A protein has these predicted regions:
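Substrate-binding cleft of secreted/luminal carbohydrate-active enzymes
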Residues: 60-145
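Glycoside hydrolase catalytic-domain groove-lining segments
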Residues: 22-73
Length: 145
């Protein structure tokens, strides 16, 4: 099972809804950072506590449930943080899901500005991640780009 609550805050804690590690194969949580400009610590602010509590503590893969950014510093900055995380700090981080919709704010990267899409594609396909004690692999390498 993929357990991915909307948000984990002190005013809306998710702990009472945790089904237990024996029932969960992947954990994740939603986060939409709103700071503008986007701080370099946004990824950690969004995910660090949840990751430590549910992914690291039980050695369960972590996949971002839903995210997007519509601040003035642009989607590319947030995409960059999503794909450039230190694998030594987040070794269970396996995936992210982008909220591709123009709703309360414009989160579009595929149907939005072509320059944002181009930046996102470059980051995703040509990003090089170095894991703890492993070689470098880019997503582009995985998809033959």
């Amino acid at each position: 099972m993929y357990w991915s609550p909307n948000v984990d805050t002190s005013s809306a804690p998710v702990a009472p809804y945790w089904p237990g590690a024996s029932y969960v194969d992947v954990v994740g949580v939603d986060c939409y950072p709103t700071s503008s400009p986007l701080p370099s610590s946004a990824f950690a602010s969004c995910y660090s506590n949840f990751y430590k509590t549910y992914s690291a503590a039980y050695d369960i893969p972590f996949a971002i449930g839903e995210t997007g950014y519509a601040g003035s510093s642009g989607n590319a900055a947030w995409v960059s943080q999503l794909v450039n995380q230190d694998m030594c700090e987040y070794p269970n981080y396996i995936a992210a899901s982008w909220f591709e919709y123009d709703k309360e704010a414009n989160f579009l990267i595929v149907e939005g500005s072509s320059s944002i899409l181009s930046s996102a594609q470059q980051l995703l396909l040509h990003n090089t991640k170095t894991g703890c004690g492993s070689g470098e692999t880019s997503l582009g390498d995985l998809f033959g780009e």
